[in-house]
């Protein structure tokens, strides 16, 4: 087996594993969600449309190019499989983020509920969220499974590793599928804490001076994204270094 074949086999296994984790953690159900990973500079491995992500098999994943053309097809029995209907959103993320090697779209229920209720989730509450993700913005509403989804993330994904998709779910990216999955978990945990605090009427944002310290740590860890300083200053009065 060649090095490229070995890498593809490993990525297929990782997509299956992460899909099972997402289902087990209640971050999607039914046919929801989709995952992809870069095979190389020209090709992506991506999940099919219409299959349960907790029950997929390695051979049911497809290979597409960066224009969305299917290079390696797959079937479910006799039924030909198509790439996820959210393929345009995945392609847009890769175009805007050449540093990214994996994209995960999920439907975490608390995050979705709060986005429908209009509860903002970019309040600086949890130190670990600030360090790992910065602010988590919410996109404008876009019809799912359409080119609108790609347009909705276009500008935001360039500066953020995690987005909340209005009424739809989340999009997280990473250097690996595991990293993108962990960022998804962090988004849902952040939403869970926001929800609990709303019940207690006790939301208390971190002081600007403490946020500034956390942003310095984020920078030192190599996690800073373009626009971090300007965004935190504009929204929360955090003075940049």
Residue ranges, per PLM feature:
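Glycine-rich flexible loops
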Residues: 1-241
């Amino acid at each position: 087996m060649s090095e490229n074949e070995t890498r593809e086999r490993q990525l297929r296994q990782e997509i299956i594993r992460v899909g099972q984790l997402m289902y087990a953690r209640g971050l999607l159900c039914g046919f929801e969600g989709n995952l992809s990973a870069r095979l190389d500079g020209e090709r992506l491995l991506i999940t099919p449309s219409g299959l349960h992500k907790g029950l997929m098999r390695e051979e049911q994943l497809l290979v597409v190019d960066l224009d969305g053309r299917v290079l390696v097809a797959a079937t479910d029995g006799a039924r030909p499989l198509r790439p996820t209907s959210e393929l345009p959103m995945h392609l847009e993320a890769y175009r805007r983020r050449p540093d990214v090697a994996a994209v995960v779209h999920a439907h975490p229920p608390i995050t979705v509920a709060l986005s429908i209720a209009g509860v903002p989730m970019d309040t600086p509450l949890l130190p670990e969220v600030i360090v790992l993700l910065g602010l988590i913005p919410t996109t404008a509403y876009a019809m799912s499974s359409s080119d609108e989804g790609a347009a909705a993330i276009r500008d935001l994904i360039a500066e953020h590793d995690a987005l909340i998709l209005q009424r739809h779910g989340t999009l997280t990216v990473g250097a690996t599928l595991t990293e993108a999955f962990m960022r998804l978990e962090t988004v849902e945990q952040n939403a869970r804490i926001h929800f609990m605090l709303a019940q207690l009427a006790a939301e208390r944002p971190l002081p600007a001076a403490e946020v500034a310290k956390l942003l310095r740590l984020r920078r030192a860890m190599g996690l800073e994204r373009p626009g971090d300083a300007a965004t935190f200053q504009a929204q929360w009065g955090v003075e940049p270094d």
